[in-house]
UniProtKB/Swiss-Prot annotation:
Biological processes, Gene Ontology terms: mRNA processing; regulation of gene expression; rRNA processing; tRNA processing
General function of this protein: Digests double-stranded RNA. Involved in the processing of primary rRNA transcript to yield the immediate precursors to the large and small rRNAs (23S and 16S). Processes some mRNAs, and tRNAs when they are encoded in the rRNA operon. Processes pre-crRNA and tracrRNA of type II CRISPR loci if present in the organism.
Cofactor: Mg(2+)
Name assigned to this protein: Ribonuclease 3
Location(s) in or outside the cell: Cytoplasm
InterPro entries linked to this entry: dsRBD_dom (IPR014720), RNase_III (IPR011907), RNase_III_dom (IPR000999), RNase_III_sf (IPR036389)
One of the record's GO cellular component terms: cytoplasm
UniProt-annotated catalytic positions: D45, E117
Length: 226
């Protein structure tokens, strides 16, 4: 990745890295290099959850724990992170292996969402908690303003199930197509099958739950609900 490309992405993110190798690693998928972004993703996931929880606690002093948990889940879920990635054009900067490139990995929601988390982890390591907190709140400014405690925050599987029930259609089936990697570092590929949709929708994630949620989200998109 050349200097011009790095500069362009840093401008989009609103942060200039001291250690450019952390930025490169955050953008590197496991299919491209053994020095990939999954550990950074793990770190970024925890930091994001803390920052959003802290913001909700102070922005909504009269909202109960259950509603705040649902609000946080909506703000940190893969679909929201993928939207942020699209806003940043992150797909243009991903380092992917040939297989992922050919299968359209640069557009895959799970890969994009994981990369946002990895970037959060890398910026934290390159700076400090205060810096990454300020940056996350900047990225989430409009979303934090728009989220409403009175809205029922439901995950994609729940929304899909309720939609199908409202149409008196059979509930979806989630089928494990592939499990890749060691027991402590697995990647799940899951298909969601729904009566009335000819094509299965796919979800890929670091856990079965995450993969099922992505498959359900893609089904909602295919049905034209979202």
């Amino acid at each position: 990745m050349n200097h011009t490309v790095i500069q362009k992405l840093q401008k989009i993110l609103g942060y200039t890295f001291i250690k450019k190798d952390l930025l490169i690693q955050a953008l590197t998928h496991r299919s491209a290099n053994s020095k990939h972004n999954e550990r950074l993703e793990f770190l970024g996931d925890s930091i994001l959850s803390f920052v959003i929880a802290n913001a909700l606690y102070h922005c909504f002093p009269h909202v109960n724990e259950g509603d705040m948990s649902r609000m946080r889940a909506t703000l940190v879920r893969g679909h929201t992170l993928a939207k942020i990635a699209y806003e940043f054009d992150l797909g243009d900067y991903l380092q992917l292996g040939q297989g992922e490139l050919k299968s359209g990995g640069f557009r895959r929601e799970s890969i994009l969402a994981n990369t946002v988390e990895a970037l959060i982890g890398s910026i934290f390591l390159d700076s400090n908690l205060k810096t990454i907190e300020k940056l996350i709140l900047k990225w989430y400014k409009n979303r934090l303003k728009a989220i409403n405690p009175s809205d029922t925050q439901k995950d994609p599987k729940t929304r899909l199930q309720e939609y199908l029930q409202s149409k008196h259609l059979p509930l979806p089936s989630y089928l494990v197509e592939q499990v890749y990697g060691e027991a402590h570092n697995q990647l799940f590929t899951i298909y969601c099958e729904i009566s009335g949709i000819n094509e299965k929708t796919i979800g890929i994630g670091s856990s079965r739950r995450k993969a099922e949620q992505e498959a359900a989200q893609n089904a909602l998109i295919k049905l034209g609900i979202e």
